[in-house]
């Protein structure tokens, strides 16, 4: 089940109302507004609890998202590029979050650097359509994946620390 910290994080991210994907042009604009509001609230919450860990932006249509996420391990900050497309069947289908710089470096990843979320995250997403959005995918998908995989990859020497301005991987 979900631990107390995750439950608290989840309860602080606004739930979305509009069930629309990129194909529903007019409703998609409303859905995007809700997505941005939830993301802004999630980032504000992270900053206020000193757990800020990603930056995202999208193309004008809101169908391609990209940015940076980071993980702090032994007081060193490891940064990774993050990207994903919004599926045409969104929100019924969750976005597939990719860390292209880690492509091929772990078994818990698909081709192109897409992180494996099938066992735990996707069933939870399916039960919460259309209430979950991008902020929820980051909180329930990418954050736990980073917390499990990055320390392991560092210990194995697969991921190495890079100075500021360089991307880890």
Curated annotation (Swiss-Prot):
Keywords, alphabetical: Ubl conjugation pathway
The UniProt record lists the keyword Protein transport: no
Single GO BP term: protein K69-linked ufmylation
SUPFAM superfamilies: UBC-like
GO CC annotations, alphabetized: cytoplasm
Catalytic residues (positions): 116
Gene Ontology MF, one: UFM1 conjugating enzyme activity
Pfam families, alphabetized: UFC1 (PF08694)
InterPro entries: UBQ-conjugating_enzyme/RWD, Ufc1
Family membership noted in the UniProt record: Belongs to the ubiquitin-conjugating enzyme family. UFC1 subfamily.
Reported function: E2-like enzyme which forms an intermediate with UFM1 via a thioester linkage.
Name of this chain's protein: Ubiquitin-fold modifier-conjugating enzyme 1
Naturally occurring in which organism (per UniProt): Culex quinquefasciatus (Southern house mosquito)
């Amino acid at each position: 089940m979900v631990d107390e910290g995750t439950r608290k994080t989840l309860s602080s991210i606004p739930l979305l109302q509009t069930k629309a994907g990129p194909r529903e042009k007019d409703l998609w604009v409303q859905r995007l507004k809700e997505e941005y509001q939830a993301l802004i609230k999630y980032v504000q919450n992270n900053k206020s609890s000193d757990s800020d860990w990603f930056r995202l932006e999208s193309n004008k249509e809101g169908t391609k998202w990209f940015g940076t996420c980071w993980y702090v391990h032994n007081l060193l900050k490891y940064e990774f590029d993050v990207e994903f497309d919004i599926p045409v069947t969104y929100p019924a289908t969750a976005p597939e979050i990719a860390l292209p710089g880690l492509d091929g470096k772990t078994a818990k990843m698909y081709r192109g650097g897409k992180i494996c979320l099938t066992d735990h995250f996707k069933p939870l997403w399916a039960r919460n359509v259309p209430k979950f959005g991008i902020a929820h995918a980051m909180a329930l998908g990418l954050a736990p994946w980073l917390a499990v995989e990055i320390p392991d990859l560092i210990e194995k020497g697969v991921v190495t620390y890079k100075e500021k301005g360089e991307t880890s991987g």
